[in-house]
């Protein structure tokens, strides 16, 4: 059975590749900002919104490829009730990291599998990350080292690189922090016979 990842995310694609999963990457055209604003206005939770976005992505691609299992995933960063999007530039990334310094935030991460336009399964994880009280000197070195690569992450960090040094404690699933609850997804795919067991 063919697997498709409804995402252009290099982190998600890399996770699947490293797990030995052959999935074609086909990004879904979804107006994420509009969906987030609409759901937030309706009082939806971050988990409901992340799942709706993941579902939209998987559903759109699964209608075009009805015989494939399509994986959609989305992640929202929540800090003290506020939702955050990716920083548009390094100046705002710096401000965000200073704002998160010494505080905890959550990465609400949802994955959905769809086939033929219908949702087959979904799963949500909400890891909690505690950012340490780092110095401005450390932050300046970190920003210089990582550069614009930080703008691809909603939290302005990559745990698989020097970004791990921003934290003193992490609670929850590592793969969910990277962008997709991989172990529950693998379990579903085996159960659905989309993977060899």
Swiss-Prot record:
It comes from Granulibacter bethesdensis (strain ATCC BAA-1260 / CGDNIH1). One of its GO terms (molecular function) is nucleoside triphosphate diphosphatase activity. HAMAP family: Maf. It holds the Pfam family Maf. Belongs to the Maf family. It catalyses: a ribonucleoside 5'-triphosphate + H2O = a ribonucleoside 5'-phosphate + diphosphate + H(+); a 2'-deoxyribonucleoside 5'-triphosphate + H2O = a 2'-deoxyribonucleoside 5'-phosphate + diphosphate + H(+). This is Nucleoside triphosphate pyrophosphatase. Nucleoside triphosphate pyrophosphatase. May have a dual role in cell division arrest and in preventing the incorporation of modified nucleotides into cellular nucleic acids. Its EC number is 3.6.1.9. One of its GO terms (biological process) is nucleotide metabolic process. It is found in: Cytoplasm. The active site is at 74 (proton acceptor). Its cofactor is a divalent metal cation. One of its GO terms (cellular component) is cytoplasm. PANTHER family: BIFUNCTIONAL DTTP/UTP PYROPHOSPHATASE/METHYLTRANSFERASE PROTEIN-RELATED, BIFUNCTIONAL DTTP_UTP PYROPHOSPHATASE_METHYLTRANSFERASE PROTEIN-RELATED.
